[in-house]
Every structure is written in structure tokens, then in C-alpha cells.
Swiss-Prot record:
Assembly description: Dimer of alpha and beta chains. A typical microtubule is a hollow water-filled tube with an outer diameter of 25 nm and an inner diameter of 15 nM. Alpha-beta heterodimers associate head-to-tail to form protofilaments running lengthwise along the microtubule wall with the beta-tubulin subunit facing the microtubule plus end conferring a structural polarity. Microtubules usually have 13 protofilaments but different protofilament numbers can be found in some organisms and specialized cells.
Naturally occurring in which organism (per UniProt): Eleusine indica
Residues reported in the UniProt entry to bind Mg(2+): 71
GO MF entry, a single one: GTP binding
Subcellular compartments: Cytoplasm, Cytoskeleton
Pfam families with a match to the protein in the record: Tubulin, Tubulin_C
Protein name: Tubulin alpha-2 chain
Length: 447
């Protein structure tokens, strides 16, 4: 088996995790207590869903997941929520003090206290696997736990499980909406270790997803639940081929191989289609070309940057539902002929496609309509540098005055770490600039 362990860190990671596991359970017909009426081969871990769920002798299906936070309230919600019986109590780790939006508390002082119990639990989860494939890590980099403890765990995973893939689903601060003044500090410090210790990171951003909810689903005032359900559809689409047997399956390592041209350039944009409310769905038919076109529109990207400002290096299209390869090939061909979607000159093919016949599942009472087919795109586009430059600018304004820095230094950090992380991010922006710019130099030689 090629198992995957999911690690949910901090409030954002845990709440996205709740939505994901709720959706996985619905997709596989697993009840909130972990029982699965349709599973006839109990105790035999041969089914595709066993990549994400382990089975006990009593027929319970337990997520291969760890939830960790430095304060108890969010984990307590899981412990009292509808899926409380799904998880093993030892998979839900909380501590008594908060990281207080401070990267240094999450990474040095408070995080250190909890990192060993987390790694012990991860080791138990890993021992329970026959062929561990990798980790999915969910966190946000604006707060203290997601950024600080998230980085610490990633660093330790690199040491203990160096050869395993690590995919991050990371929520970055939004341009307009802010939940903490020190977000730019936490994000820059955290990105420093994401560059080093993850293989692929999918960038998400609340503001972009708010806009999608308002525009496509007609939700006046979206809540985090609305956002997380949308995020969970993306993550579910990416992991479908790991959890179901499909026509063209895509392995986790295949994402890496196909999307990452250079090790540092592994920050991806994601988009999903069709995002459509129940009222509208009755009147529209979504063909493969239509949904394929819509994932390339800037309005469907789940991070605040415009892919038209950049060039694509590669993209992964994951179709699910009533889709045949012939339609996909035609849709991809028409995208390639469009002038709006620009690829870098050194990557002419640029498309990786996966198809899974399992149609998309929706949460009962949720916002999305049930559709016959859907597509999720993960793309490597140079425009993602816009996200970094925006955070850098805010970082520089604060750091020039050394504002709030004493809170970090007081928790055992050194000021040098700020400038080191900032320089690393500047280098990353430069890298993106260079991979996109290789075109112009060649053109000059031709004329």
C-alpha cells in the first residue's frame, strides 16, 4: 500500500482538516463512527481508501492523521464534534498555552514542548503503514502555531523521513484581510523553511476564496466553513487518485516530478471548476472544455495573484466524474492554442492529466451543487511571486522600524534570522523572475 499521513497544524490546519475528513468519509461511505457498511474485506487493507484510513479488527476506519495545536479550544471542538468517534484520542494533541501569533513561540519555546509527542505519534502512524508514501501538511503561515510549529515539524520530518514526499497546503495572508499585525513576519520566517523542507506547496489565500464564494456561490458573507468546504474539494480532487482506482491515476510523487522544474520553485496555484450553487446548477451543463477553460481564468485561482501576469511552467489537471480521455485531449489542445495561457519556452508540453471516474461528492446542506464532472488544476506559474512580493513589502515596512521584533527575540530568536529569511525570499522571487525571463534572451538572438 502507498499510505499518506495527513498532519493538521494550528487552527487553520485543523479546521481545513475537519472539512477534508468529513468529505472523505462521505466519498467512501464511512460513517462518523468509523464503520463502513460497504467494506466487505474487513481487516484486509487492500482497498484504495486504505491509503488514507487504517482499519482496526473491529471494523473501524481510522484516519491516518494527526491534529496538533498549542491551545486546546480548536481540538476540543473536534473532540465534541460529529466526527469525535472517528479519531483516536491520541491523534488529537493540544497544549495549554497559545503561540500568540508569534512564530518564535511556535518554533522555539512552546512548540519545543510538544514536538516530541507529535513525532512519537507520527512514528506510530508510520509504523502502521506498509509503504508510507509521504505526508500532507496543512497549516496557515500568518499565525504563530501554523507558522512556527509547522516549520519545526517540517524540519524534524526532513530529518526522520528524508526520502518521503511532503506536500503542503498552506494558507497565506491575504492582501486586504488580516487577522494579525505580525502576519508578514510569521509568513516570511515560515516560508524560509517551506522552501527548504517541502517538495510541493499549494498556496491558498482566504481573500481569493471569499471572492469565489461571493461571485460564484452568491454567498453574501462567507464564513470559514464555506471557505474550508471549497478548499476540501480541491484537496479531495488531488487525492482522489490515491483513494480510488481510476483510469489515469496520479501518485503523490508524480505531482513533484511533473510540477517542479527546480527544487526551490515548488509553490503552486490551485483552481477548481465548476464552482456553482445549487440554484444555478439546474440550468447549466458543464462540458469538459467549459470547465477546463474556467480553471485557467484568473477569477478561479485560489490565491490572490493573476496567472496572466506570469507564465506557466507546468500544470496538473485532475478530472473526476463523467470524463473520457478524448475530451480531455481536445480541451487541452484548445488551451494550448489560446494566446492567453502562456507557457515558458523551455517547457512546451506542460500538461499532466489525471482522470478518475468517481464523480464529485458534495456535503449535504453545503454550498456546492452536485455535478457530473469537475476538474481541479494545480499549476506552477511565475505569477505566484506576486504573493511573496506583497508579503515582503509589508515585512520591510515593519522591519525597517524593528516594530514588534522584541516579542520574537524575547522568545529566544535572533534578529539575524529575520534578515536571513527575508534574503531567502528575495532570492526566491529572483528565481521566479529568471525562470520566466529565459524567453526574452533567446528572442534577441533570433532577430
Amino acid at each position: 500500500m502507498r499510505e499518506i499521513i495527513s498532519i493538521h497544524i494550528g487552527q487553520a490546519g485543523i479546521q481545513v482538516g475537519n472539512s477534508c475528513w468529513e468529505l472523505y468519509c462521505l466519498e467512501h461511505g464511512i460513517q462518523p463512527d468509523g464503520l463502513m457498511p460497504s467494506d466487505t474485506s474487513l481487516g484486509v487493507a487492500r482497498d484504495a481508501f486504505n491509503t488514507f484510513f487504517s482499519e482496526t479488527g473491529a471494523g473501524k476506519h481510522v484516519p491516518r492523521a494527526l491534529f496538533v495545536d498549542l491551545e486546546p479550544t480548536v481540538i476540543d471542538e473536534v473532540k465534541t464534534g460529529p466526527y469525535r468517534q472517528l479519531f483516536h484520542p491520541e491523534q488529537l494533541i493540544s497544549y495549554k498555552e497559545d503561540a500568540a501569533n508569534n512564530f518564535a513561540r511556535g518554533h522555539y519555546t512552546v512548540g519545543r514542548e510538544i514536538v516530541d509527542p507529535c513525532l512519537d505519534r507520527i512514528r506510530k502512524l508510520a509504523d502502521n503503514c506498509t509503504g508510507l508514501q509521504g505526508f500532507l501538511v496543512f497549516n496557515a503561515v500568518g499565525g504563530g502555531t501554523g507558522s512556527g510549529l509547522g516549520s519545526l515539524l517540517l524540519e524534524r520530518l526532513s530529518v526522520d523521513y528524508g526520502r518521503k514526499s511532503k506536500l503542503g497546503f498552506t494558507i497565506y495572508p491575504s492582501p486586504q484581510i488580516s487577522t494579525a499585525v505580525v502576519e508578514p513576519y510569521n509568513s516570511v520566517l515560515s516560508t524560509h523553511s517551506l522552501i527548504e523542507h517541502t517538495d510541493v506547496v499549494v498556496l491558498l489565500d482566504n481573500e481569493a476564496i471569499y471572492d469565489i464564494c461571493k461571485r460564484s456561490l452568491d454567498i453574501e458573507r462567507p464564513t470559514y466553513t464555506n471557505l474550508n468546504r471549497l478548499i476540501s474539494q480541491v484537496i479531495s480532487s488531488l487525492t482522489t487518485s490515491l483513494r480510488f482506482d481510476g483510469a489515469i491515476n496520479v501518485d503523490i510523487t508524480e505531482f513533484q516530478t511533473n510540477l517542479v522544474p527546480y527544487p526551490r520553485i515548488h509553490f503552486m496555484l490551485s483552481s477548481y471548476a465548476p464552482i456553482i450553487s445549487v440554484e444555478k446548477a439546474y440550468h447549466e451543463q458543464h462540458s469538459v472544455p467549459e470547465i477546463t477553460n474556467s480553471v485557467f481564468e484568473s477569477s478561479s485561482v485560489m490565491a490572490k495573484c493573476d496567472p496572466r501576469h506570469g507564465k506557466y511552467m507546468a500544470c496538473c489537471l485532475m478530472y473526476r466524474g463523467d470524463v473520457v480521455p478524448k475530451d480531455v485531449n481536445a480541451a487541452v489542445h484548445s488551451i494550448k492554442t489560446k494566446r492567453t495561457v502562456q507557457f515558458v519556452d523551455w517547457c512546451p508540453t506542460g500538461f499532466k492529466c489525471g482522470i478518475n471516474y468517481q464523480p464529485p461528492t458534495v456535503v449535504p446542506g453545503g454550498d456546492l451543487a452536485k455535478v457530473q464532472r469537475a476538474v481541479c488544476m494545480i499549476s506552477n506559474n511565475t505569477a505566484v511571486a506576486e504573493v511573496f512580493s506583497r508579503i515582503d513589502r509589508k515585512f520591510d515596512l515593519m522591519y525597517a522600524k524593528r516594530a514588534f521584533v522584541h516579542w520574537y527575540v524575547g522568545e529566544g530568536m535572533e534578529e539575524g534570522e529575520f534578515s536571513e529569511a527575508r534574503e531567502d525570499l528575495a532570492a526566491l522571487e529572483k528565481d521566479y523572475e529568471e525562470v520566466g525571463a529565459e524567453v526574452e534572451e533567446d528572442d534577441e538572438e533570433e532577430y
